[in-house]
């Protein structure tokens, strides 16, 4: 299906776009959909542009602003598709020029537009009126020797590419910023342009930045290798709470003292246990992790301490237990409170004497193992209730370490998000744009009762539900969570007005609008928005086509359904 531009086809109503803007002054935030926005003086942007040009030169500055605009265009194309699902896909493209204007970037006057998504055809010509970048140059920086609308040009290329699903390139053929009468642009597929290698080079990361990043990456990798070799790997985090954990581990790691890790479920106790092992002199020896709650009570002794042949039915071969396999290294017993009384007694002997006997055997075996245990329950209460041996508790509780929950490590969430997204992108063979700003804010404010494990699961769900090159939204992470934010919004006249759940209804009543007039207005607006297509307008209002046609005929009895078209 193709679309050739005609003036009457331009989608004039942008209420669906402007309604996405929220000014939440109480929080100091402005939102466009799920992306956080800023209002900034043009003179500030002019100073920024001047500094960038003086710092890296005109050519590199041009590439920088083109890439900046390109990223913004990608996000706005995603927003346009979400807000206009009932319209023909080609007509959704017109949301791009409206978002240009809504952001104060430029007014767009489309001259020609011929789009065929299935055929990969894209030809657009337009005039840009009052570009903010032209104003910057004409009033602050002076005229230049080439077109200056770099950010807007990058935006158009990013928006067009995301919309078409293929590489679209816009070029500015004339520009008021270099003395021309008008700002004119032409957009075509990369193939139609021919050799555009010199222009496409602007969209590649700057070599200086790449080289610096590559060096930083190499240094970081070397540091990580040194840390792992020296046993200083702790996982992910830089919050004060996490740094305190690392300092505590440092003090205990080099000895052989028993460490008891305390904390809620999902806080990363096994990661901390591995950190203790890697930091110790036993780093080159085995690290064996056991979840005591996952082993049936009647098998826990044989699993931990081994079994001799014939000890019980089915024991046809002798088998070493986890303690013997960890000899010389470290064993980590998670959910240690789940040990049976007999297993607790055997564990106490191992700690006191450094020896054990396999189940069904009579031979004493020496073991040299460092013990790290963990629980999310209160062991002292378990001792009082008779569930856990007091003498064993005192042996385990020599060096207790409390691991804080994720809600007390909010600063670590962005790092953890980046880590888990990288992992799941690789696992599912896709690359999203990461979390939307609102989704990240939701993560920072959520209490995370399941801690890091719950965060990882939520991010995995987000990656699964989100298409490549789209942002992960709040709904994908937290199904059913309300995302609406009360605040001030833009009215149709461009003024800020307070909005809450029922403010729109109050406004209708205050203006004396009748139910009949309201229905008629909804019908007309839906039809205008959908290019007089009854089926699309019906979907927009949640009606069937016959119901929509009936209401339209009721609104205008002289109108025949056949004359109304589709």
Curated annotation (Swiss-Prot):
One of its GO terms (biological process) is catabolic process. The keyword Hydrolase does not apply. Keywords: Activator, Aromatic hydrocarbons catabolism, ATP-binding, DNA-binding, Nucleotide-binding, Plasmid, Transcription, Transcription regulation, Two-component regulatory system. ATP binds at residues 263-270, 326-335. Residues 534-553 bind DNA. Gene3D superfamilies: 1.10.8.60, Homeodomain-like, P-loop containing nucleotide triphosphate hydrolases, Trafficking protein particle complex subunit 3. Pfam families: HTH_8, Sigma54_activat, V4R, XylR_N. It comes from the Bacteria. SUPFAM superfamilies: Homeodomain-like, Ligand-binding domain in the NO signalling and Golgi transport, P-loop containing nucleoside triphosphate hydrolases. One of its GO terms (molecular function) is ATP hydrolysis activity. Residues 235-464 form the Sigma-54 factor interaction domain. CDD domains: AAA. Regulatory protein of the TOL plasmid xyl operons. In the presence of m-xylene or m-methylbenzyl alcohol XylR activates both the xylCMABN operon and the regulatory gene xylS; xylS itself activates the xylXYZLTEGFJQKIH operon. XylR interacts with sigma-54. PANTHER family: PTS-DEPENDENT DIHYDROXYACETONE KINASE OPERON REGULATORY PROTEIN-RELATED, TRANSCRIPTIONAL REGULATORY PROTEIN. This is Transcriptional regulatory protein XylR. It comes from Pseudomonas putida.
């Amino acid at each position: 299906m193709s679309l050739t531009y005609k003036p009457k086809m331009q989608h004039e109503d942008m209420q669906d776009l402007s309604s996405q803007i929220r000014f939440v002054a109480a929080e100091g935030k402005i939102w466009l959909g799920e992306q956080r926005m800023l209002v900034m003086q043009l003179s500030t942007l002019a100073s920024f542009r001047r500094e960038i040009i003086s710092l890296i030169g005109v050519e590199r500055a041009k590439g920088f602003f083109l890439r900046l605009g390109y990223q913004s265009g990608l996000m706005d194309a995603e927003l346009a598709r979400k807000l206009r699902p009932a319209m023909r896909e080609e007509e959704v493209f017109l949301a791009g020029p409206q978002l240009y204007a809504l952001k104060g970037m430029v007014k767009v006057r489309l001259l020609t537009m011929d789009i065929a998504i299935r055929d990969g055809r894209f030809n657009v010509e337009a005039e840009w009126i009052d570009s903010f970048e032209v104003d910057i140059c004409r009033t602050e920086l002076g005229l230049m020797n080439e077109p200056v609308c770099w950010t807007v040009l990058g935006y158009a290329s990013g928006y067009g590419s995301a919309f078409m699903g293929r590489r679209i390139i816009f070029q500015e053929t004339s520009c008021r910023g270099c003395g021309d009468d008008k700002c004119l642009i032409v957009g075509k597929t990369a193939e139609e342009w021919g050799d555009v290698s010199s222009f496409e080079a602007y969209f590649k990361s700057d070599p200086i930045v790449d080289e610096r990043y590559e060096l930083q990456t190499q240094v970081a990798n070397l540091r990580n290798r040194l840390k792992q070799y020296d046993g200083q790997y702790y996982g992910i985090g830089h919050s004060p709470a996490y740094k305190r954990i690392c300092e505590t581990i440092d003090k205990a790691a080099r000895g052989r003292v028993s460490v008891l890790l305390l904390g809620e479920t999902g806080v990363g106790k096994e990661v901390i246990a591995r950190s203790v092992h890697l930091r110790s002199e036993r780093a080159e020896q085995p690290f064996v992790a056991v979840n005591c709650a996952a082993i049936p009570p009647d098998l826990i002794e044989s699993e931990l301490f081994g079994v001799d042949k014939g000890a019980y039915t089915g024991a046809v071969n002798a088998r070493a237990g986890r303690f013997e396999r960890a000899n010389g290294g470290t064993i980590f017993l998670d959910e240690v409170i789940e040990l049976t009384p007999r297993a607790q007694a055997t564990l106490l002997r191992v700690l006191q004497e450094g020896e054990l006997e396999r189940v069904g055997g009579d031979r004493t075996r020496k073991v040299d193992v460092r013990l790290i245990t963990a629980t999310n329950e209160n062991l002292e209460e378990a001792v009082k209730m008779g569930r856990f041996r007091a003498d064993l508790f005192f042996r385990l509780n020599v060096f207790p370490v409390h691991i804080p929950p994720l809600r007390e490590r909010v600063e670590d969430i962005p790092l953890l998000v980046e880590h888990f997204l990288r992992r799941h992108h690789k696992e599912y063979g896709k690359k999203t744009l990461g979390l939307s700003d609102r989704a990240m804010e939701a993560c920072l404010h959520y209490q995370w009762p399941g801690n890091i494990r719950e965060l990882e699961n939520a991010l995995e769900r987000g990656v699964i539900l989100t298409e490549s090159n789209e942002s992960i939204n709040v709904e994908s992470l937290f199904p059913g969570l309300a995302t609406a934010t009360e605040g001030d919004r833009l009215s149709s006249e461009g003024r800020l007005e307070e909005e809450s759940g029922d403010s729109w209804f109050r406004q209708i009543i205050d203006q004396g609008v009748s139910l009949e007039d309201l229905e008629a207005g909804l019908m007309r607006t839906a039809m205008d928005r959908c290019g007089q297509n009854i089926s699309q307008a019906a979907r927009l209002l949640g009606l069937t086509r016959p119901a929509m046609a009936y209401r339209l005929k009721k609104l205008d009895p002289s109108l025949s359904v056949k004359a109304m078209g589709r």
